[in-house]
Amino acid sequence: ILRCLVGSEMCIRDSNADNSSQAESMVDESGIDESLTDSSVTHDDADDLSDAVFIGDSRTVGLQNNCDKPKATFLCSVGMHIDTVMTDQNITLSNGNAGTVIDALGERQYGRVYINLGTNELGWPYIDTFKDYYTQLITKIQEIQPDAVIYAESILPVTASRSLQGDAINNTNVATFNQAISEVAQQTGINYLDCTSAVAGADGTLPEEASSDGIHLMSEYCDKWLNYIIDNT
């Protein structure tokens, strides 16, 4: 089941079944590619992801919209933050009521849990605070999903032009926060999944053609991202 809040509307779709307000608005108001469904990248059909759940912000919403994996579960929302992911009631539960990501995770057991959070937090001044909230989330997931393999994904890079705009959404901050995520993964005993190479060019940045706003991925690059996840987990 896809359960997500896109924009201001709660939604549930059958799929089997930021602390800087400036940074947040720049990520969330930029739009998600939902129209480019054709892709030159072949979908990896060997894994239907029926045992997988994806937790994340608008980039994960974009992944769901373009990945053609109807049996995967997506618990995602535009503007999802690490400090409120466990308390915001922005997920539609199986009974139709609004609930948290944690509530939704309690409805069934998964084999794999993928977390992609941090883009909206790139403006946070205190990296230790980010790490504390990330650790709390992982600890709670481990409690609710004791048999699941948990993957903390890296924050994907942004384009070079987006990185040079002079705000918090830049690749220097991406690298800093990814180091923090890697450290949290090691400390909590989960897996750190560096997806950068799946979408980055030779210079380590997101290619300009990969995104209409420098942040959110076009369909082809969503396929590259998902194929990397499938091939490496």
Can you annotate each of these PLM segments?
Residues 13-31, 35, 39-42:
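Intrinsically disordered, low-complexity serine/threonine-rich repeat tracts
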Residues 158-233:
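Catalytic His-Asp segment of secreted/periplasmic serine-dependent ester chemistry enzymes
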Residues 42, 46-133:
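Conserved SGNH/GDSL esterase-like catalytic core that processes O-acyl groups on lipids
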Residues 134-138, 178:
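Generic structural signal for well-ordered alpha-helices
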Residues 145-149:
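A short helix->loop->beta-strand "cap" motif at the edges of active sites that frequently abuts
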Residues 1-14:
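Single conserved hydrophobic/aromatic residue that forms the stacking wall/gate
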